Amino acid sequence: MTKAVINSYVLFSKLEQGREGHLQTLQEQLGKISFVEAVFPKYEKVPFIKQLVAQSKKRTGKALLESEIGCLLGHRKIWHLIANKIDCENEHFLILESDSKIIALDTLVNAFAQTVSINNNSKYDLFFWGAWNGNTRIKKSTQIKWSNKYSIGEPLIKSVYGTYGYSITPKAAKLLLKQTAKINYPVDYFKYHLSNTNLHIGAIRPAVIDTWKTTASNIVYENKGLLIKRWLIMQIFDFRNMIIAYFC
């Protein structure tokens, strides 16, 4: 097995059950890995959580779940760590979650070195290695072929959801901290967090990072009916995004 040498952060809590094997696999795959404690309001006291829920509804018309706020706070902890790395402003740091699954390690290693980490001087500030269950769409005008099977370019921002496999620079971390300083949308609603910013965003398709899907979500309750409904909705939106991306 190829072992990556990528500075990586994994959001994880000892309160999560059934994901220890996932973490062991990530440790075997990645050379530099740091664990950051996840935030779970249902298990721990989060100051002003009720007020934060109320404020999110006031700002957007829809209240965030406490678990969604916890997820956002967890990623903000990682962004703070990266934002403080002032000596490596252009270096990329990989961010994963406890159920992240690297499905193409060699591709991740090579693409990371050749695309986002060229002498620590990447043209991208934020790069998605997997998002929205592999349904990220890349704008055709920016798309370049990479290693036969893959395409790299600027993603259609409305096709990017999920925080289980992305990398950012300290510059991007600082901007995300600023954009999410007021609790309003879930952490993976990038179409809101990244609007009117000058960040250079990239993505790869097919995805090289996915999720294991062997344990239940820690954010929202999902039964079989909801999963089927979500899958159908995703197919409809993916078809729409495919057409939009073709003309972008």
Residue ranges, per PLM feature:
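An acidic/histidine-cluster motif and surrounding catalytic segment
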Residues: 2-96, 100-248
